[in-house]
């Protein structure tokens, strides 16, 4: 059974949920950020949870990071991860032009339907593999403004 957190605990605990298409790099971003290592090879995720601690503004912030499956077959399970989320990070691949479109049409809609007032951050992945940087940057900025994302 989950215990209720005190107000003080809630101020220092943040739940982040990463969502996006299969193979856009959600797990790679999470592992690089929390474990300071880049994963070798690709293994599809169903659900996974990572924990980390970061120092922000002189305070220790405990992170609970949910890595969700991008595969459509698991779409009914995904909202389980959405409960009590503080921020959604919607990932898209910078090397796949359609990935940004799906992020904004599919994933933003899914989050807004389930967690209406939760912040959404759009995360472009695979920057190291990207070409046509300026054009993609303009497209991304336009989508961020249009959908009121961070």
Q: For the regions a protein language model found, what residue spans apply to each?
A:
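Ras-like small GTPase catalytic G-domain
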Residues: 3-19, 28-36, 49-150
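Conserved glycine(s) of the Walker
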Residues: 25
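Post-Walker A helix-loop "phosphate-sensing" segment adjacent to the P-loop in P-loop NTPases
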Residues: 35-43
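ATP-binding glycine-rich phosphate-binding loop
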Residues: 46
